[in-house]
């Protein structure tokens, strides 16, 4: 008997899986059920069978739910049957058509290929026949032309022979007429060698005799014989001899030039110019011949040979220049002078002026010549490289850059310009120092002489560097000029401003009067009167004001110089001088120059602040403080009396007008306007302090409003600065002091303010309301602002 507390374990019977069916039979067989005798085992089997029954029922339900969908799909499939049969028939028909078309195309194309092959063979046969005929024609023509000394015609026949397809000739030699063709070839080769020897000999004779027509005649024959390089080399040698002969003639003429001659100062630049112009004429004259007879891309070879001779002649001219102008000695002298604590006697800058001008002129002519070569060679390469690969184009560009950048002409000019920059720096520094030392001021002028002199020198030096057509040279001079203006010259002006404007306070006036009385008393005892002390103060004032004008003009001059350089260099860059790197370098130099202009503006602002605090503030403060002496707690009678006899503002305006008149005559309009702006700001701040320490009644507030309006109206006429913005707080204070009652402020505050923007805080509004003696403090405190 099995244990009732534990489920029976039936051997060979597995637990049915939930939801697993799929049309399988029960795992419990009928034989197993019949063999069971225990009730508990029967119950266990029954439960399992019931579980399997539930699974089967769920599977049946799921299949029955899909019945409608499956039936509808079957109906659709039955309907598609006829259509699918039609499609099958059409597809078979289309496949047959495609197969037929493919076979037809294959047959046609094979026949076309056969036709093309036959056509090509026919052409080859015709070409072979033509070449054989040409070969015989060339042989007969060469012999006839040589006998009649018609070398051009002989060269043309030889060129035709050389252009024949060698493989065709080789095949012809294997045919029936091979022996005849061999004989013709041998005769042609002998004629070719004979013609080459004759052309070389005739060309040599023509060059020796200087017979240019004959030289050009045989020069044109070389490429017909396949001697492109030899022809260019021999012709270049002839041209180089001409260049050398003319250059030596020009140099001898230069060395014999009288120093009083008008062009004596630039004779070496003129010599180089003649050399470059001569080579340029040669290139222009013979470029069409080279392009026509030698083909595009060959001009580079001709110019390469010419440039070697040009370098030789440039070296001779520059050596004579260095020796006759004592260029290296002058440079060493300048270099010693530029060193600190140098005891060497300084060289006079005027002695360097003509040398520096000539060097820049020499470099400008060289740059122009090199740009000419670059343009000619580049255009020639472009024609020849129209169908070439990118590698070939890059290789040609490298050859061009190497020729122009590494030639002796470029290296020599770079060396001269390197020394020039140092000498130009010395010239600029010494002449600027001299201009500062000789600074003078003429009465009636706003600036002193050194400003115009210094900027004339700076413009001259930068302009001279610009005329060299070298961007590196120009950038170096701009940087040196920037340093000179920023450091040395600005320091001169800064030191003058640091001396300050002589104070004009009441105590200073008292001391001045006492000193003047003592000087007069002493002078009267000695029988003379010395005004040096008084004059020195006036001179110090004028010096300060003139320095301010100088600073302002310097800033403007630097900005103008920057714009001028931008315009001038735009023309240079448009001519192909420099590239993107040179443009970026130049822009950086101009940015540094513009920064110096801003530094001069900052210095001007410092000077104006000093003038305002020293000359204006000590005077304005007592005039504003006199506001305290005028009561603004007045009755109707006093208000009317103030109307007729203004107690304060008219005298204050008169004092301001008299004080500013002194500066108006001595300062530039821009500086005077800036100073007036500082003065108005000072008046607004100081008057606000005084008002907040005063008391008012209703009529007193009205009187203050009239005074403020008169003051604003006057200041508006003397400056272009916005006055009302500076006096906005005072105007709002006057509005508050004009109120009839405390709560009236709410008509102007918050949502009721309209376009008015309040500059006063709520605490400041209460503070101003408290200045009215007729307003109760309790009412002011109750305000909700």
Swiss-Prot record:
Belongs to the COG4 family. One of its GO terms (cellular component) is cytosol. GO terms for molecular function: identical protein binding. The keyword Membrane applies. It comes from Homo sapiens (Human). The gene is COG4. This is Conserved oligomeric Golgi complex subunit 4. Its main location: cytoplasm. The modification N-acetylalanine is found at residue 2. It is found in: Cytoplasm, Cytosol; Golgi apparatus membrane. Required for normal Golgi function. Plays a role in SNARE-pin assembly and Golgi-to-ER retrograde transport via its interaction with SCFD1. It comes from the Eukaryota. Residues 741-785 are annotated as: E domain. Keywords: Acetylation, Congenital disorder of glycosylation, Cytoplasm, Disease variant, Dwarfism, Golgi apparatus, Membrane, Phosphoprotein, Protein transport, Transport. Disulfide bonds: none annotated. Residues 85-153 are annotated as: Interaction with STX5. It is a peripheral membrane protein. Residues 2-84 are annotated as: Interaction with SCFD1. InterPro entries: COG4, COG4_C, COG4_M, COG4_N. It holds the Pfam family COG4_C. The modification Phosphoserine is found at residue 6. Residues 618-740 are annotated as: D domain.
């Amino acid at each position: 008997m099995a244990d009732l507390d534990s489920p029976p374990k039936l051997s060979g019977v597995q637990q049915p899986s939930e939801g697993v069916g799929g049309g399988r039979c029960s795992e419990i067989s009928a034989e197993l059920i019949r063999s069971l005798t225990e009730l508990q085992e029967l119950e266990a089997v029954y439960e399992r069978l019931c579980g399997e029954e539930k699974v089967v029922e769920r599977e049946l339900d799921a299949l029955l739910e899909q019945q409608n969908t499956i039936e509808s799909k079957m109906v659709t499939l039955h309907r598609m049957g006829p259509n699918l049969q039609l499609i099958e028939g059409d597809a078979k028909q289309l496949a047959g058509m495609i197969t037929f078309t493919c076979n037809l195309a294959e047959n046609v194309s094979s026949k076309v290929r056969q036709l093309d092959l036959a056509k090509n063979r026919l052409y080859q046969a015709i070409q072979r026949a033509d070449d054989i005929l040409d070969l015989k024609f060339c042989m007969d023509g060469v012999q006839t032309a040589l006998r009649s000394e018609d070398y051009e015609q002989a060269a043309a026949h030889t060129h035709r022979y050389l252009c024949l397809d060698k493989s065709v000739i080789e095949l012809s030699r294997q045919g029936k007429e091979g022996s005849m063709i061999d004989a013709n070839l041998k005769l042609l080769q002998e004629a070719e060698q004979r013609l080459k020897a004759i052309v070389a000999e005739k060309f040599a004779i023509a060059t020796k005799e200087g017979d240019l027509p004959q030289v050009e005649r045989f020069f044109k024959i070389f490429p017909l014989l396949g001697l492109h390089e030899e022809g260019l080399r021999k012709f270049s040698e002839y041209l180089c001899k001409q260049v050398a002969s003319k250059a030596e003639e020009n140099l001898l003429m230069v060395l014999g030039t009288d120093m009083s001659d008008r062009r004596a100062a630039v004779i070496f630049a003129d010599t180089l110019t003649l050399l470059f112009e001569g080579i340029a004429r040669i290139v222009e004259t013979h470029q069409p011949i080279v392009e026509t007879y030698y083909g595009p891309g060959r001009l580079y070879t001709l110019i390469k040979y010419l440039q070697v001779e040009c370098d030789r002649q440039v070296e001779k001219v520059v050596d004579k220049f260095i020796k006759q102008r004592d260029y290296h000695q002058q440079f060493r002298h300048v270099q010693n002078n530029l060193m600190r604590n140098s005891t060497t006697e300084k060289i006079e800058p005027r002695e360097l002026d003509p040398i520096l001008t000539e060097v820049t002129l020499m470099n400008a002519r060289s740059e122009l010549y090199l740009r000419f070569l670059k343009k000619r060679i580049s255009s020639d390469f472009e024609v020849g490289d129209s169908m070439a690969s990118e590698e070939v184009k890059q290789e040609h560009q490298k050859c061009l850059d190497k020729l122009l950048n590494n030639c002796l002409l470029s290296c020599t000019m770079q060396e001269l310009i390197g020394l020039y920059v140092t000498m130009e720096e010395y010239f600029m520094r010494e002449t600027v120092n001299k201009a500062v030392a000789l600074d003078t001021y003429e009465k009636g002028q706003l600036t002193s002489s050194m400003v115009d002199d210094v900027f004339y020198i700076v413009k001259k030096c930068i302009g001279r560097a610009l005329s060299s057509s070298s961007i590196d040279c120009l950038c170096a001079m701009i940087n040196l000029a920037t340093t000179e203006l920023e450091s040395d010259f600005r320091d001169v002006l800064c030191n003058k401003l640091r001396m300050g404007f002589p104070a004009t306070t009441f105590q200073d006036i008292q001391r001045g009067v006492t000193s003047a009385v003592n000087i007069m008393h002493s002078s009267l005892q000695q029988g003379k009167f010395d005004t040096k002390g008084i004059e020195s103060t006036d001179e110090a004032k004028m010096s300060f004001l003139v320095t301010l004008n100088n600073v302002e003009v310097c800033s403007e001059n630097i900005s103008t110089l920057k714009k001028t350089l931008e315009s001038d260099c735009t023309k240079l860059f448009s001519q192909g001088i420099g590239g993107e790197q040179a443009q970026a370098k130049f822009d950086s130099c101009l940015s540094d120059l513009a920064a110096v202009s801003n530094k001069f503006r900052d210095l001007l602002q410092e000077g104006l602040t000093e003038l305002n605090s020293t000359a204006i503030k000590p005077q304005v403060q007592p005039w504003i403080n006199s506001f305290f002496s005028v009561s603004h707690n007045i009755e109707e009678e006093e208000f009317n009396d103030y109307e007729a006899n203004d107690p304060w503002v008219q005298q204050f305006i008169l004092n301001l007008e008299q004080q500013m008149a002194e500066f108006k005559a001595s300062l530039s309009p821009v500086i005077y306007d800036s100073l007036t702006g500082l003065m108005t700001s000072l008046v607004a701040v100081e008057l606000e302090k005084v008002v907040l320490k005063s008391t008012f009644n209703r009529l007193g507030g009205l009187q203050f409003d009239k005074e403020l309006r008169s003051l604003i109206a006057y200041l508006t006429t003397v400056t272009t600065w916005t006055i009302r913005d500076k006096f906005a707080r005072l105007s709002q204070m006057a509005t508050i002091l004009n109120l009839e009652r405390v709560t009236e402020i709410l008509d102007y505050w918050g949502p009721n303010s309209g376009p008015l923007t309040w500059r006063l805080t709520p605490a400041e509004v209460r503070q101003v309301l408290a200045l009215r003696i007729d307003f109760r403090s309790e009412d002011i405190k109750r305000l909700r602002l």
